[in-house]
Amino acid sequence: MQRTLRRMALSIVERTGKRASELCLVGVRRGGVDVAKRLAEAIADLEEEAPKVGAVDISLYRDDAATALPDAKIGPSEIRFPIDGREVILVDDVLQTGRTIRAAIDCVLDYGRPRRIWLAVLFDRGGRELPVHPDFVGKTVDV
């Protein structure tokens, strides 16, 4: 797992062309937050500075919110830095249908207008229902 995160961190640094201090990693609650923190640490090991890290809770942004909300545990979104004009890397642990990422993008846009939103996922399982494609993938798992 550590090797995969290091490889993803190197790819993020190379492809974005930005210093770590210019990047914002935003993890999707729940699984994406830990991945975002670990990616930030791996980037800091490469760049000697860490990117900012935040988190979004997408419970209210889901397209099935009306049916899912009675059982949903809504947590806080924590983006405590400006994202206007910044490079934001949305981070999740697993990408499959794309619906979670669509909701996460909507949530991020409520905080401002980033220059660009990248997508990093630890596992890409395929099975898309929406046109979502990750920029950085740890491992691809066929379902």
Label every model-predicted segment.
Residues 1-143:
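PRPP-associated nucleotide enzymes
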